[in-house]
Amino acid sequence: MKKLLLAVFSITATFSLYAQREVPQERMEQIYEEVKTPYKYGLAVAPADNYHKIDCPTVFRQGDKWLMTYVVYNGKGGTDGRGYETWIAESDNLLEWRTLGRVLSYRDGKWDCNQRGGFPALPDMEWGGSYELQTYKGRHWMTYIGGEGTGYEAVKAPLYVGLAWTKGDISTAHEWESLDKPILSIHDKDAQWWEKLTQYKSTVYWDKDKTLGAPFVMYYNAGGRHPETDLKGERVGIALSKDMKTWKRYSGNPVFAHEADGTITGDAHIQKMGDVYVMFYFSAFEPSRKYKAFNTFAASYDLVNWTDWKGADLIIPSKNYDELFAHKSYVVKHDGVVYHFYCAVNNAEQRGIAIATSKPMGRSTVRFPKPEIKNRRQITTLNEDWKTWITEATHLKGNFMMRAKTVNIPHNWDDYYGYRQLTHGNLHGTAMYVKDFTADVKSGKRYFLRFDGVGTYATITVNGKDFGRHPIAVSYTHLTLPTKR
């Protein structure tokens, strides 16, 4: 009888342990409601020209300042630039950012001479917590993408994981010290199949409970081919350390992946909500999605077994600044507002850092530079310096005159917020928008005006010619212009 009871207890305990690995759907829905950010604020950091791309935000707090590191690629295309460097910016309100300078620069003659894309380590993992970076042995730490190949990421040569540190003030721009060799490489004797092609972004967390047997837990994504299916993709794995310098790969890697050829699962950003760890991550080229890249989340009780969220994605392409890719999360909650930082890429392949929020926080004034377009069709952007004034409105009575103001479009006298921009204020009426521009007429060329609208209808007049009343709220209006007045 004792043996039978022992066997029953053993089966029950095993089942309970297995069941706990799956985060219940009800809890996943609670997490989604807590972290969703339906209001897109716009760009926070954008390059000043078309020969730089900004990527991979990491946001943290130091004293009364918010800081953000990000990586900068100094090329227009994938092969014409040298590679990544790491920069830092500061903010008072998480929305408006000032660039301070570099923290990881190119260094000639080293293993990482052309690629130095960094990610600060040991952040406070508590959701809504301090978001400060912890020190270990009197230093702040950072892992980074490193390599000698030029170009965007691993386009010419594999990338490895490097380690940097500083004893200085992390709220200032100064060069961090670095090791003379990578801490993880695809050539290591214990390198695993899922990372044999290249290694990418990494972030190190300080797990003082030593859940996996060591205090320092690195999540990193890497490229490799599955040994059984031969599917090529990016997956997320773990490495462990007791001293930040010597690392051992977790035997159960990869811990998180989506097995479809060419699919990317990466850039894990983890925070703890009560007894549940939440991993914000991005996926790209997922066959089940119509868009190319997006941000979503998974949850875990043990840092290893992750339950994927099956509901609506957190960030998807929906604006003219993120229409190609909206991906690579860094999420913080401060004073009751959730800020979701992500990398925004448009169809011109301009790349910057954008923000979405859980509450309406206004609209950013940061814009990408005008794209360079070299093809048979020449496109001239006419979004700047429009004069506008209201001619009639529901909140104004009787005859009135108001002074015109100069704005850049898109512009609205009312505020529109919410998913699909369906919720708006109470201002109804008519506004005038006027712009003077000159287009040189060339023989054999046709000229068009395209309007993307935010109102309901627009009556359009060009050079005194009335083009009529057009609905331009949902899509766009395309007008063919005469080449003679």
Q: Which residues are covered by each model-predicted region?
A:
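Short strand-turn-strand beta-turns centered on an Asx-Gly dipeptide
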Residues: 461-467
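Residues within well-ordered beta-strands of beta-sheet-rich folds
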Residues: 122, 219, 434-436, 448-450, ...
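Conserved small/polar residues in nucleotide/adenosyl-binding loops
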Residues: 477-483
